[in-house]
């Protein structure tokens, strides 16, 4: 006797399953064809631990980036022979056996530059090339030049780069945009995903998935050819984020995938390792030791996963905002990540259609629609009136409002009535004289009050504009630009983060001194300058008085989600 034909809901469930099984093979194939470079804590074992614990360098990243002058196994053998000998000098041993990273030259801009001129002049200063690296270097080679954030950093970072690329495009450097997309595609083909940054010690995690948005940006210049060219890499990245989904039962999690009790599929941040981060070794060990009630490996994994989120660190991940050792990133389903996954699915549908595969496009649309329903069901706090993260331990949406709540608006996944409530919540709780607060909590962590970060300012601005909430959107842009301009007027630089409780002050907190440069601030500043000033009268500095522009009255016409029932 024939089995009954599957019902419509069963058919809908079969479509994503097919996609996940097909793409799991892509992820495995990418991993099998590459030899993963070992991070320095594995290559050097006890020597790495001893050097970092000795605090030979003010910044723990210094030794993580040091290049062994010979085979690490030989260096380690020499160390074991010499370390207990009388008069052994660890610093001298390191200086003899390693090439330490050079301090970046401090950039002194020409006098009298406008804000726009300063940013345009920085692009070549921040550009690096690493087609070839030393054999045991933690730096991973990339085929094309790339733009680093600036300051402390010698490598390219994943999610930073999207906002940097917005500025490159605004400056007309489409060649650099294309180079950076090609580099990230190379990483996907080589490692199966885009690591946090191009360092061996970042390979165990990724960052907020903006690659599909980068390809979409490039398509503004190159048309559908860009979408078709990078469709395979977008599919591989999607496979990475959904790896393990085909074996999940309801209520289970596997790496970056979460399957809730009703079968809803969402994602979380995850790092494959559960050891201290090489670039913050001593700090991570101290954090783990400060909470003996939790396994150290669990704390290490959650610290690493918070780094994967880009929000390292924030009260958003903690039970107690004043105690970093209470963070539990892996038991939280983030609203921003799932918004980006929704956007990835939508762009994959568009790219599949451009490539002539309508059946595959429909499957991605099905996945996007299912995720959108999941966002509305699990990542909306109806009592508070804003989007928020979901807690896997309490099985409830969290109460905290953060700037991540604007991501559903940014990717056009929000219901129209909820977007209106988000505008009210943003203006009431997050908008400050110097821009948008990251959260309203003062924890001393850098992704909390009073700090404001350029990418979140842009996500909020564009997200609110997508739903016609132009007044609040323009308030955010104007407040943040004023902050950037005041800081530039005083210090002649753009910085990584800003204190938004006032104007003209760089932000605090974090694991390293405030950085200048700064890639994503440069990009967002250029976008906002063009937003507040009329096209016929572009401004090179932030005007002394707020101009009226078409943007303040005309909403950006985007497709909106239907109101929630």
Curated annotation (Swiss-Prot):
<dbReference type="GO" id="GO:0042597">
    <property type="term" value="C:periplasmic space"/>
</dbReference>
<feature type="binding site">
    <location>
        <position position="152"/>
    </location>
    <ligand>
        <name>substrate</name>
    </ligand>
</feature>
<keyword id="KW-0378">Hydrolase</keyword>
<feature type="binding site">
    <location>
        <position position="511"/>
    </location>
    <ligand>
        <name>substrate</name>
    </ligand>
</feature>
<comment type="subunit">
    <text>Monomer.</text>
</comment>
<dbReference type="InterPro" id="IPR012341">
    <property type="entry name" value="6hp_glycosidase-like_sf"/>
</dbReference>
<feature type="active site" description="Proton donor/acceptor">
    <location>
        <position position="496"/>
    </location>
</feature>
<feature type="region of interest" description="Disordered">
    <location>
        <begin position="539"/>
        <end position="565"/>
    </location>
</feature>
<feature type="active site" description="Proton donor/acceptor">
    <location>
        <position position="312"/>
    </location>
</feature>
<dbReference type="Pfam" id="PF01204">
    <property type="entry name" value="Trehalase"/>
</dbReference>
<comment type="similarity">
    <text>Belongs to the glycosyl hydrolase 37 family.</text>
</comment>
<dbReference type="InterPro" id="IPR008928">
    <property type="entry name" value="6-hairpin_glycosidase_sf"/>
</dbReference>
<feature type="binding site">
    <location>
        <position position="310"/>
    </location>
    <ligand>
        <name>substrate</name>
    </ligand>
</feature>
<keyword id="KW-0574">Periplasm</keyword>
<feature type="binding site">
    <location>
        <begin position="205"/>
        <end position="207"/>
    </location>
    <ligand>
        <name>substrate</name>
    </ligand>
</feature>
<dbReference type="InterPro" id="IPR001661">
    <property type="entry name" value="Glyco_hydro_37"/>
</dbReference>
<dbReference type="GO" id="GO:0004555">
    <property type="term" value="F:alpha,alpha-trehalase activity"/>
</dbReference>
<dbReference type="InterPro" id="IPR023720">
    <property type="entry name" value="Trehalase_periplasmic"/>
</dbReference>
<keyword id="KW-0732">Signal</keyword>
<feature type="binding site">
    <location>
        <position position="196"/>
    </location>
    <ligand>
        <name>substrate</name>
    </ligand>
</feature>
<feature type="binding site">
    <location>
        <begin position="277"/>
        <end position="279"/>
    </location>
    <ligand>
        <name>substrate</name>
    </ligand>
</feature>
<feature type="signal peptide">
    <location>
        <begin position="1"/>
        <end position="30"/>
    </location>
</feature>
<dbReference type="GO" id="GO:0005993">
    <property type="term" value="P:trehalose catabolic process"/>
</dbReference>
<comment type="function">
    <text>Provides the cells with the ability to utilize trehalose at high osmolarity by splitting it into glucose molecules that can subsequently be taken up by the phosphotransferase-mediated uptake system.</text>
</comment>
<dbReference type="InterPro" id="IPR018232">
    <property type="entry name" value="Glyco_hydro_37_CS"/>
</dbReference>
<protein>
    <recommendedName>
        <fullName>Periplasmic trehalase</fullName>
        <ecNumber>3.2.1.28</ecNumber>
    </recommendedName>
</protein>
<feature type="binding site">
    <location>
        <begin position="159"/>
        <end position="160"/>
    </location>
    <ligand>
        <name>substrate</name>
    </ligand>
</feature>
<dbReference type="GO" id="GO:0071474">
    <property type="term" value="P:cellular hyperosmotic response"/>
</dbReference>
<keyword id="KW-0326">Glycosidase</keyword>
């Amino acid at each position: 006797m024939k089995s009954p034909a599957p019902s419509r809901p069963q058919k809908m469930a079969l479509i994503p399953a097919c996609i996940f099984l097909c793409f799991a093979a892509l992820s495995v194939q990418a991993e099998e064809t590459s030899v993963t470079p070992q991070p320095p804590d594995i290559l050097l074992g006890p020597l790495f631990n001893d050097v970092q614990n000795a605090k030979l360098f003010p910044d723990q990243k210094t030794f993580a980036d040091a290049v062994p002058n010979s085979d690490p196994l030989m260096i380690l053998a020499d160390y074991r022979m010499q370390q207990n000998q009388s008069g052994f000098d660890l610093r001298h041993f390191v200086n003899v056996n390693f090439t330490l990273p050079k301090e970046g030259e401090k950039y002194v801009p020409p006098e009298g530059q406008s804000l726009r001129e300063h940013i345009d002049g920085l692009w070549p200063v921040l550009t690096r090339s690493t087609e070839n690296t030393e054999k045991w270097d933690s730096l991973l080679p990339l085929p094309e030049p790339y733009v680093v954030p600036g300051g402390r950093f010698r490598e390219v970072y994943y999610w930073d780069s999207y906002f940097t690329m917005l500025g490159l495009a605004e400056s007309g450097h489409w060649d650099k945009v294309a180079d950076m997309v090609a580099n990230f595609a190379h990483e996907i083909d080589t490692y199966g995903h885009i690591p946090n940054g191009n360092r061996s010690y970042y390979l165990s995690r990724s960052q907020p998935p903006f690659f599909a948005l980068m390809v979409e940006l490039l398509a503004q210049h190159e048309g559908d050819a860009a979408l078709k060219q990078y469709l395979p890499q977008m599919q591989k990245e999607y496979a990475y984020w959904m790896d393990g989904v085909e074996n999940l039962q309801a209520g289970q999690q596997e790496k970056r995938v979460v399957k809730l009790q009703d079968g809803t599929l969402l994602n979380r941040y995850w790092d494959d390792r559960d050891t201290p981060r090489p670039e913050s070794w001593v700090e991570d060990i101290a954090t783990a030791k400060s909470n003996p009630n939790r396994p150290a490996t669990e704390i290490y994994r959650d610290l690493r996963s918070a780094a994967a989120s880009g929000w390292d660190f924030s009260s958003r991940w903690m039970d107690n905002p004043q105690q970093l050792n209470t963070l539990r990133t892996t038991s939280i389903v983030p609203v921003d990540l799932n918004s980006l996954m929704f956007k990835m699915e939508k762009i994959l549908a568009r790219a599949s259609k451009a490539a002539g595969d309508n059946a595959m496009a429909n499957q991605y649309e099905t996945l996007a629609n299912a995720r959108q329903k999941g966002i509305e069901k699990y990542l909306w706090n109806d009592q508070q009136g804003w989007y928020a993260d979901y807690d896997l331990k309490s099985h409830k949406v969290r109460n905290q409002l953060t700037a991540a709540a604007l991501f559903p608006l940014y990717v056009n996944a929000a219901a129209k009535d909820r977007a209106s409530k988000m505008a009210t919540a943003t203006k009431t709780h997050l908008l400050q004289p110097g821009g948008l607060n990251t959260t309203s909590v003062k924890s001393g962590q850098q992704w909390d009050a009073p700090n404001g970060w350029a990418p979140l300012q842009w996500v909020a601005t564009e997200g609110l504009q997508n739903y016609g909430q132009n007044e609040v959107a323009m308030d955010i842009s104007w407040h943040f630009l004023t902050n950037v301009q005041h800081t530039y007027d005083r210090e002649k630089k753009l910085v990584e983060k800003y204190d938004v409780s006032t104007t003209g002050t760089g932000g605090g907190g974090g694991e390293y001194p405030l950085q200048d440069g700064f890639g994503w601030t440069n990009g967002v500043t250029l976008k906002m300058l063009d937003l507040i000033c009329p096209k016929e009268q572009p401004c090179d500095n932030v005007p002394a008085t707020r101009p009226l522009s078409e943007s303040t009255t005309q909403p950006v016409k985007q497709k909106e989600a239907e109101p929630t029932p």
